[in-house]
Swiss-Prot record:
Pfam families: GrpE (PF01025). Participates actively in the response to hyperosmotic and heat shock by preventing the aggregation of stress-denatured proteins, in association with DnaK and GrpE. It is the nucleotide exchange factor for DnaK and may function as a thermosensor. Unfolded proteins bind initially to DnaJ; upon interaction with the DnaJ-bound protein, DnaK hydrolyzes its bound ATP, resulting in the formation of a stable complex. GrpE releases ADP from DnaK; ATP binding to DnaK triggers the release of the substrate protein, thus completing the reaction cycle. GO terms for molecular function: adenyl-nucleotide exchange factor activity; protein homodimerization activity; protein-folding chaperone binding; unfolded protein binding. The gene is grpE. CDD domains: GrpE. InterPro entries: GrpE, GrpE_coiled_coil, GrpE_head. GO terms for biological process: protein folding. This is Protein GrpE.
Length: 199
């Protein structure tokens, strides 16, 4: 009798046994699902999915940082280029106009030489020497970017000319007499010409 009991399980025992087997198979499937070695190809575990999302987020973050770094480098390069250009322009301006004060003082010498030439006797050998000196000085000034502004007969320009009197014989708004020549340094006015202007 006891042998029959051991060989034949009751219906309740069969159900319990089936339930245990079913639970074991579910557990085994669940373990396989979370086992990275078991999952390959298109199968994804929740854990792997979480890791992949984290990984993608980190990649996006790093790409953003790289983009910011590239933009920062481009801005820094542009600023450095602009600064270099500004320095070159400033150096160029300094070269062009460093002699401005010195040149103005030289103009007084030119004026004195011109007055001496006007008042000298044409046959005087000293006057000839003064003329040669005047010519040589003007050549040096020209070589260094200093040009004569002699507006005789031109339209009056307040930016280039200084009107000190009226010339009754000249046409209206026209320079009649140049009392003192003007000069420019590399295209920039160094001294305006003193003139008489027609009304």
């Amino acid at each position: 009798m006891s042998e029959q009991n051991t060989n034949h399980e009751s219906p309740e025992q069969n159900v319990a046994h089936d339930n245990i087997e079913h639970s074991d198979s579910i557990l085994e499937e669940t373990m396989k699902e979370f086992d990275p070695q078991h999952n390959s190809g298109e199968e994804m575990t929740i854990e792997n999915e979480i890791d992949l999302d984290t990984f993608k987020a980190r990649i996006a973050e790093l790409e953003g940082e790289v983009k910011e770094a590239k933009e920062g480098t481009a801005r820094a390069n542009a600023e450095a280029y602009d600064a270099q250009k500004r320095m070159e322009q400033e150096a160029d301006k300094s070269k062009k106009f460093a002699l401005q004060k010195f040149a103005r003082e030289l103009l007084e010498i030119v004026d004195n030489l011109e007055r001496a030439i006007e008042n000298a006797d044409a046959n005087d050998p000293v006057a000839e020497g003064v003329q040669l000196t005047h010519k040589a000085l003007l050549a040096v000034l020209h070589k260094n970017g200093i040009e004569v502004v002699d507006p005789q007969g031109e339209k009056f320009n307040a930016d280039l000319h200084e009107a000190v009197d009226i010339d009754a014989e000249a046409e209206a708004d026209t320079v009649g007499t140049v009392l003192q020549k003007g000069y420019s340094l590399n295209g920039r006015l160094l001294r305006p010409a003193m003139v008489r202007v027609g009304q």
